[in-house]
Each structure stands twice: as C-alpha cells, then as structure tokens.
Amino acid sequence: MPSPDDRLTPIHAYLHQSADVLRATADACAEDIAKAVDLLVACYRGGGKVLLCGNGGSAAQCQHLAAELVNVLSRDRPRPPLAAIALTTDTSVLTAIANDFGFEQVFERQVEALGRPGDVLIAISTSGDSPNVIRAVARARAQGCRTVLLTGGAGGAALAHADVAIRVPAADPQQVQQA
C-alpha cells in the first residue's frame, strides 16, 4: 500500500501544473480578455444579447456563464440581468436539428434564428476544431454578430472566424477547460 506521501505527490504535481497554466494564461491572454470584455460591453450597451455554444464540458461552461450573466456574478456588485442564451440547453431544438440536418448544424441553425447584428457569440472549444462550433462561429460572423472563441493551443479551424480568441497556452483539454 502506498504511503500517504506517495498518494499526495501526483495531487501536488497536478495542482501546481494547473496553477502554472493559469499564470501562463494570465500572461498570454490578458489583452484578448480585455478585447472580449469590450465586445460584451458594446453588445449590452447596444441592447444585444450573448449566445454561447460548446460541446461536452464546454456546453456545461456555456450554461454556467449564461446563468451568471442573467443572474449576477457577485452580490457585492449589483447590476441588472444581462441577456444570455446557452444554445446547449433545449433538447427538443438540439435533437430536431441533429435529426433533420445533422449534429454539425445544431448551433449554426440556432445562431441563424436568434443572432442579430451586434450580438456576441461566445464559442467554447478546447481544440477549436469541433465542426458544429466552427459552423456556428462562421454563421454568427456572417450575420453581423461579433465572435469570441475560448480555446487552447493553436485555436483550431474556428480561429479563422473569431473576432477575439482567448487561447489558453496548453494542449491538455483538461487544463484548457480549467483555465
């Protein structure tokens, strides 16, 4: 049986590695984060809304962010609710589109229906290569929406359609999602 110290070694290593990725993200992404904030402020000041899309864990992050925008991030800083829609939540819409048009269009068709010029699409993809995310970002941009991509590494194919890309400097999807 391993000693308690042996069990702690991988835990410490993982947590220190995660902290290193967060520090590297702060150094590499601060300017792009500020640009994304500027897009969001302009969107909300113009009466727009934020749409969010992603798959798997990224879908969960979309839902969490939408909830925080509609509700409030901190009670210490009161503000009105902000319009935000996670395109990952309506199972009837998702399955109808997937069945009739293919999974690659589950976000694109929702952006086509809901997105308006001045809105912002936040797309989350650890690789930037998810076909349904790429199509959504391309559609949003074609419709006059601004686009923010949260991704890792090189940013993948979605990068070509993003107004702002926040690229976590890590290749491991778990570390990208944590940052």
Q: Language-model segments: which ranges?
A:
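Short glycine/serine/threonine-rich phosphate/pyrophosphate-binding segments
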Residues: 58-63, 129-136, 158
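Short alpha-helices
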Residues: 151-179
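A short, well-structured juxtamembrane/interface segment
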Residues: 28-46
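Glycine-rich, small/polar surface segments that engage phosphate groups of diverse ligands
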Residues: 42-115
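A short, small-residue-rich loop immediately preceding and capping a beta-strand
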Residues: 49-53, 117-128
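Generic N-terminal amphipathic, Lys/Arg-enriched alpha-helix
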Residues: 1-28
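Surface-exposed amphipathic alpha-helices with a cationic face
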Residues: 137-143
